Each structure stands twice: as C-alpha cells, then as structure tokens.
C-alpha cells in the first residue's frame, strides 16, 4: 500500500485525525477528533485532480447530488465537534456531512458529486457556522456589512435608525416601526429579527407588537424596568412564545437585583450584559448568572478584561445613554456601572460556562464587527491565566474550551431566541450559513461567508486583475448579496405574525420564519455553558465569589488577534 507522510497529507488534503492546529496567533490548540474520509478516496478539485467526469464526479441528475460541496473542511462547531469532512449543500441547506465523490466507482460515498455540483475547496480551512449577534441596536444599516464581513450571519435586536431611543435601547416600538423595519430587512444579506418595546404595565401594547412581527420584547431601564413591567412582559411572552431580553435597573430605583429576580417568577429571560458595565443593577447584577431560568450574555467592550477596559467605558457610557458630564448625578450613574472587579470575574465566569452567550451591543457600547474576535481573545486570556480546563487536562489540546466558546455566539443565542431549528450549528437540515477561515486568520478575517448556500461576501482582490488574488484584497459583497438572491437570507418573526394579514399585506420578499420554543429554554439547555454557580458580590469592595471561590484575574496588557492583523 502506498504511504504518505502526515505533513504531505495535511498540505494536500488538510489535517486529519490526531493532527493539531493553532487558532490564529492565540495559545488555543485544536486537535482533529474524526475524519469522515476514506484514505486514498479523498475528493479534491483542480487540474489533474479527483473531481473530474468519470472519476470523482458521477452522472447523477441534480436531484441526487449536492448543489455545492465543500471538500475536506475542518469543522469547528459546538454540536458537530471538531471533525474533518466533506459538506454537501442543497437547496440552501446543509444536506449532508460525510464523504463526497462518485458512488459509481468509490466506496463509502454519502455526498454524490455530479455535473450540477459546484466545489468550494476546504482543504486546510476551518469551517464554522455563521455567528449570531443577539444584541443589535439598529442604528445604521452599515452595521450589517461590518457584521457580515466578520462572520456574523444573523442579527437580532431593536431600533429604527439613529433615533435617540435606538441609541440607548434595542427596541423597535409599535406596529408602524416594526413593519417598516421588516420591509427594510428585505434589502440585506443577513438573517434579521426585531425586538419590540417591552416596557408597559398592561398586555395590550405588547401583544400588538408581537402580532406585528417582533421575535421578542426588550425591557430596558431607560424606559422603566419596574417589577410590574417585568411581570407583564413575561406574561405576554409566555402566552405568545417569544423571548424577553432585559437591561435591568442600574440605579436600583424600583428594587434591587433580588427584586428583579423575584419578578421573573422562574420564567425564562435573556439578561443582557449580565456583568453590569453595559447596564444593570449596580453592583451585583452578575448574581443573575446563577439562576436556572436566566440565560446570561455579555457585550463585547468588557471582553476580555484588559488594561484599557475601564478607561474607555466612561465616555462610551455618557454618549450612549444621553448623559450630561456637567451633571454630577449623571456622572455618578456612569461610574457606578464600571467596576474592574466584576469585569475580571466575567472573564472567569465565561471560562467556567456560567456566562452562556456573547454579543455586541452595536454602536451603543459595543462593536458590531468584533463579537468573534472578542470571544476568542477571552478564551486565549483564560488559557494563559488559568491553564487547561478540567475537560481538556492531559489531552494536549483545547477542544472542549473551543467548543464552549464557539457555542457562545452560535448555538446558544439560537436556542435562546427560538431559531435553533434553522441556524446556529453545522447540522444537516439547517440553513447553510457557513464561514470558511484560514487557520492563521481564524476569528479575525474570514475568507468566505455563505448565506443560505450562496457566497454572500468574501475577501477579494482587484476586480481588474488577471487572477482573483492581487492587492488590494478587501471584503466585498458577492452575488448572494444582490437582487433576488437575498432570499438566501430569512427574516425571523413571531408565530402570531405569520397568521397576521397585516404582515402578509407587506408582501415581503425574504422568507419569514417563526421563532419557536422560546419559553421552555433553561440555563441547562445552553450548550457547554450551563453552569449555575451561587454568586456573591461584596457591596463595598465589589469582590465576586462563585460558590465561595474568589474570582480574581489580572487585566491583559497584550492580546492576540490584534495589531498583528490590522494596520489601521
């Protein structure tokens, strides 16, 4: 039998079982857990290679073959694991994960390739599910380009543009605004969903927003997040199967964190920026991560804790929440939210799986294009400061930690907001929202972004060059971002909206997909991130303990995935 060295094999077909890779310039190491290929029967496209007529390409009709095959890709996914496989796409969905080729002459083929199949070379590349950012202020549409080019393919949030209310809160208030935003969503290669304003003491104003098309309701302290508003909002959400997101009462005007937790009455809720710098009961909203019904997320400015984190937050907060630096009370409000002790604890609670999700808080104390980067910078910092997780101990890799962190911006926000039946992981039947990365650029600069099976964006060279690669190489929209191909993206709505004639009358062009199962989600359902430690915060020193253990870590003075990759 012919043999080949591991190095030569990896250079030709990508890494295989037992091979290890470094993610970008971090200290995170992945190891391939499984390879679906049959050695000697790999498929690869190119001159003199396998995918040619009568060889790796068979004679089947379109109904029997993949529309697209991504060959020899290394999947990194919270659900699928860290596995090497061919991935077949069909009708905009992930059709099969397995072994591609020509079943007429090759053994073990699960993804037939034919004349109707396009090929994307995944050799030496990492394939992830498109990211999900569940904390979007819809301040400007240009955010969508930034998010897409960073590897995010689903954006959930609220707002109407650069209105003062949207600068501060993720709410698209009332049926008129909701319908206009649903119409605007048709123009973008992005899955989108909208939150209505959840601050009301009677159910009527909330129900009409859900019927108009929002996928959830947002309670925000700037609109008055009182116990009565919380209770009313959750009651409507339970009735109509939508999620509730909350930014709690920083000033503790209508109660303390215990008051808010009591108002939940054990019902499911997504707590935004649960550390508190982004807003919430000062100084101890972080206690919420210990509740079985609370699904906690972070926003990315505090991720990870660095020597610059505290300094940048004060001015950011003053602008975003319409505060006046000349008013002492406004300054005191801002300063109460920025605490180095709880930000440091947030790092550790992410690493232990107590914080379940990562998000941006786009243009409103968060950077929309940095959800992915900040997630992996946090993972790197924790690897350096805390060493291997118990689940990875002695294995020589960081596979479990990597699955834990990628879940924070893929499957967990999908589960939380009732869209995991469509997006959030690399599983057969889900929308083919996929991102290809060179390992050296993982988490920083993707190579290709697919939406619904079609390339929507890519790092592309000079369009007038004789080949695709000459400088300037920068991110450009591809054909999936134009015309009726925008139907490769979806707009998420409530179940009530699908039955609403007023929504049908909008004649929206992108497919509408209803959220489902939002009210039965528990912290235990958060993949690799379901820990519920008992949290204590000292009201004087802000020191945080989890199950009695002191949570302390130093700020980072240097990070990977930073200036090495960006000139400007």
Swiss-Prot record:
N6-carboxylysine sites (modified residues): 218
Q: Which InterPro entries match?
A: Amidohydro-rel, Metal-dep_hydrolase_composite, Metal_Hydrolase, Urease_alpha_N_dom, Urease_alpha_subunit, Urease_AS, Urease_asu, Urease_asu_c
User: Could you confirm whether the keyword Magnesium appears in this record?
Assistant: no
* UniProt key word Cytoplasm: yes
Cofactor note text: Binds 2 nickel ions per subunit.
In Gene Ontology terms, what is a biological process of this protein?
A: urea catabolic process
Q: Where in the cell is it found?
A: Cytoplasm
Annotated residues that bind Ni(2+) 1 are located at 135, 137, 218, 361
Which cofactors are required for activity?
Ni cation
Catalysis: reaction(s): urea + 2 H2O + H(+) = hydrogencarbonate + 2 NH4(+)
A GO cellular component annotation here is: cytoplasm
Query: What enzyme category does the UniProt record give?
Result: hydrolase
In what residue span(s) does the Urease domain sit? 130-568
- What does the entry's PTM section describe? Carboxylation allows a single lysine to coordinate two nickel ions.
EC number(s) given by UniProt? 3.5.1.5
Positions binding Ni(2+) 2 in this chain are: 218, 247, 273
Q: In which pathway does it act?
A: Nitrogen metabolism; urea degradation; CO(2) and NH(3) from urea (urease route): step 1/1
At which positions is substrate bound?
Answer: 220
The positions flagged as active site in the entry are: 321
Keywords, ordered alphabetically: Cytoplasm, Hydrolase, Metal-binding, Nickel
Q: What is its main location?
A: cytoplasm
Assembly information from the UniProt record:
Heterotrimer of UreA (gamma), UreB (beta) and UreC (alpha) subunits. Three heterotrimers associate to form the active enzyme.
Family of the protein in this entry: Belongs to the metallo-dependent hydrolases superfamily. Urease alpha subunit family.
Quote the protein name from its UniProt record. Answer: Urease subunit alpha
What gene name is listed for this protein?
ureC
């Amino acid at each position: 039998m012919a043999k080949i060295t591991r190095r030569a094999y990896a250079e030709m077909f990508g890494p295989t079982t037992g091979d290890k890779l470094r993610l970008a310039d971090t200290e995170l190491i992945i190891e391939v857990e499984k390879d679906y290929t049959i050695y000697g029967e790999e498929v690869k496209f190119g001159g003199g290679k396998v995918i040619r007529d009568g060889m790796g390409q068979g004679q089947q009709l379109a109904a029997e073959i993949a529309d697209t095959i991504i060959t020899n890709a290394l999947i990194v996914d919270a659900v699928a694991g860290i596995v090497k496989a061919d991935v077949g796409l069909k009708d905009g969905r992930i059709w099969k994960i397995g072994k591609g080729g020509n079943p007429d002459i090759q053994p073990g083929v699960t993804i037939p390739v034919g004349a109707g199949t396009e090929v994307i070379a995944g050799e030496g590349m990492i394939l992830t599910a498109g990211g999900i950012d569940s904390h979007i202020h819809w301040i400007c549409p240009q955010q969508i380009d930034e998010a897409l080019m960073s590897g995010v393919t689903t954006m959930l949030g609220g707002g109407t543009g650069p209105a003062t209310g949207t600068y501060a809160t993720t709410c698209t208030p009332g049926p008129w605004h909701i319908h206009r935003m649903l119409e605007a969503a048709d123009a973008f290669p992005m899955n989108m969903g909208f939150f209505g304003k959840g601050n009301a003491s009677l159910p009527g104003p909330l129900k009409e927003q859900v019927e108009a098309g929002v996928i959830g309701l947002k309670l925000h302290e700037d609109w008055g997040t009182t116990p009565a508003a919380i209770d009313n909002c959750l009651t409507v959400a339970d009735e109509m199967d939508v999620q509730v997101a909350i930014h709690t009462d920083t000033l503790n005007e209508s109660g303390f964190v215990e008051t808010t937790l009591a108002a939940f009455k054990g019902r499911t809720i997504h707590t935004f920026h649960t550390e508190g710098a982004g807003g919430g009961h000062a100084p101890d909203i972080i206690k919420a991560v210990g509740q079985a019904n609370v699904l906690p997320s972070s926003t990315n400015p505090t991720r990870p804790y660095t020597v610059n984190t505290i300094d940048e937050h004060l001015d950011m907060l003053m602008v975003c929440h319409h505060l006046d630096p000349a008013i002492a009370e406004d300054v005191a409000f801002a300063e109460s939210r920025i605490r180095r002790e709880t930000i440091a604890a947030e790092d550790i609670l992410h690493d232990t799986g107590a914080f379940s999700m990562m998000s941006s808080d786009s243009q409103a104390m968060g950077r929309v294009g940095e959800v992915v980067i900040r997630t992996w910078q946090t993972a790197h910092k924790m690897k350096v400061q805390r060493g291997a997780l118990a689940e990875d101990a002695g294995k020589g890799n960081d596979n479990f930690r990597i699955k834990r962190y990628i879940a924070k911006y893929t499957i967990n926000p999908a589960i939380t907001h009732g869209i995991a039946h469509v997006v959030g992981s690399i599983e057969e039947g889900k929308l083919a929202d996929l991102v290809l990365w060179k390992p050296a650029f993982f988490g920083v600069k993707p190579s290709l972004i697919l939406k619904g099976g079609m390339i929507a964006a890519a790092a592309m060279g000079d369009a007038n060059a004789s080949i695709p690669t000459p400088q300037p190489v920068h991110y450009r929209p591809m054909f999936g971002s134009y015309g009726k191909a925008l139907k490769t993206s979806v707009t998420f709505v409530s179940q009530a909206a699908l039955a609403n004639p007023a929504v049908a009358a909008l004649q929206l062009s992108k497919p509408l997909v209803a959220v489902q199962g939002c009210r039965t989600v528990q912290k235990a359902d958060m993949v690799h991130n379901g820990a519920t430690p008992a949290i204590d915060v000292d009201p004087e020193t802000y020191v945080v303990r989890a199950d009695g253990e002191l949570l302390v870590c130093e700020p980072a003075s240097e990070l990977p995935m930073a200036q090495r990759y960006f000139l400007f």
